[in-house]
C-alpha cells in the first residue's frame, strides 16, 4: 500500500494551489518494484485527478488575477535595485491564461529590459573610459562594441569610440 500526495504549487512563492492524496496498491519482489507497480496503476482519468487539476488551474488564475499589481510592483522594485533579470523573470512568469495581468506584465518586461540596456550602456562606457585611461584601447573599444543603437547613451559611446580610434 502506498499513499502519494500530489501538489500543484509555485515553488518560488511557496504557494500551493491544489493537492490530493491517492491510495495505491502495488506488487513487486521488493519495496521499490512494489512502489513502481503502484505508480503505474494510476488511472489519470480518475475524477479526483481531473478535479485536482481543474482546481489547481482555477487557483493559479485567481492567484495571478488577485496579486497582479503586487507582482508588477515587485518586479519594478527588483529593477530599481538593478536586479533586471530577476525582475524580467518575475513578470514573464505570469501565465498567458491570465490575459489582463499577462499583457500588463509584457509591458513591464519591455520597460525593465530597456532599463537593463540603459544600465549596461552606462556600465560599458564607464568600463571603456577606465580601459582608455590605462591605454588599453582594444579593450575600451570592445566594451563600446556591445552598445546597441537604441539606447540613449549610444551617441556618447560613438564619441568615445571616435576618440579611441583617433588615438
Annotated model-derived regions:
Residues 1-17:
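Surface-exposed short loop/turn segments
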Residues 16-142, 149, 155-158, 162-167:
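C-terminal/domain-edge helix-coil "capping" segments
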Amino acid at each position: 500500500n502506498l499513499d502519494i500526495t500530489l501538489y500543484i504549487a509555485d515553488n518560488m512563492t511557496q504557494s500551493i494551489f491544489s493537492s490530493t492524496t491517492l491510495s495505491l496498491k502495488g506488487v513487486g519482489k521488493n519495496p521499490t518494484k512494489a512502489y513502481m507497480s503502484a505508480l503505474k496503476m494510476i488511472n489519470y482519468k480518475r475524477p479526483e485527478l481531473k478535479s485536482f487539476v481543474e482546481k489547481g488551474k482555477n487557483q493559479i488564475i485567481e492567484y495571478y488575477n488577485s496579486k497582479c499589481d503586487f507582482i508588477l510592483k515587485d518586479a519594478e522594485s527588483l529593477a530599481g535595485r538593478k536586479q533586471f533579470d530577476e525582475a524580467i523573470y518575475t513578470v514573464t512568469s505570469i501565465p498567458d491564461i491570465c490575459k489582463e495581468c499577462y499583457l500588463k506584465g509584457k509591458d513591464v518586461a519591455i520597460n525593465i529590459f530597456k532599463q537593463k540596456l540603459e544600465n549596461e550602456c552606462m556600465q560599458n562606457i564607464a568600463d571603456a573610459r577606465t580601459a582608455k585611461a590605462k591605454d588599453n584601447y582594444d579593450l575600451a573599444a570592445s566594451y563600446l562594441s556591445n552598445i546597441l543603437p537604441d539606447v540613449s547613451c549610444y551617441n556618447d559611446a560613438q564619441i568615445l569610440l571616435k576618440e579611441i580610434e583617433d588615438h
